[in-house]
Amino acid sequence: MLIYFGAAVKYEGRGMEQLSEFERRLMIAQGKKIERTQFTELSETKVITAREYYVPGDTTEATAFAVLATVGNMPKDNVIKLLNVDLNSSRAGALTCLKRMGANVETVSRREKNGDVFGDVEIKQIASGKRLQGRRFSEDVIATALEEYPLLAVAACYGEGETILRVPKEVRKEMRPKNEFLAVNLRKTGAEVGVYDDGLVIRGLETIVNGSDFDGGDSAQIGLALSVLSLALQNDEPVENMDKVEAMFPGVVDKLKNVLVAENAEKKE
């Protein structure tokens, strides 16, 4: 980062820098500690150049808005516009999955800055009489949507037919207990949820009228997904153990509530 602003920095590192983005995410998901050593030499720099550095909006939050706008009782003709969403190929898999299921999700602009790809995404209601369709998603696709996995599972509960969400081999052992915990919550809706070593198999319902007493446990991602489900079901009871959700996604639940009431809602990332 300092080099980007003109500082004379020499850096040598070993550890995380030798890992790909996918490998880093897998190790984090596995709970492994990534050790690294580094050597930094900073020479005198007389002038630091002011430059703009932009960080795209979070993909997980964007996916939460997309799922709720798709399955929730959003006012007719509302358009949800998500600004500056991270569209890097290693992170945008969940939005692609939703589109394949039939969600009305469109990338209306795409930009690149500092090596990151980001853009604006619009979500509209599915056409009247239609619903999400069950799909099979391979390990390679899910590898780009690991943090959004619980949100895709919620969407699958509304899908027609069977949805298969295959987990990459490297994280199956670590994700199995999380998937079992998630499945306990999703089954409260009446959806059929099978938990297997290689992921979840979900047979959705045309209409979900039941479902409450959801518990986010110790996972911010599961808590966020269940919050989306609870809002879609218009539950009065809050999801339990939401502290981790608020810590990782501050204020997101209040913003999500606006999806169901605001017209032409626009969210800036």
Which residue stretches match the model-derived regions?
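Short, structured segments at the rim of ligand-binding sites
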Residues: 1-269
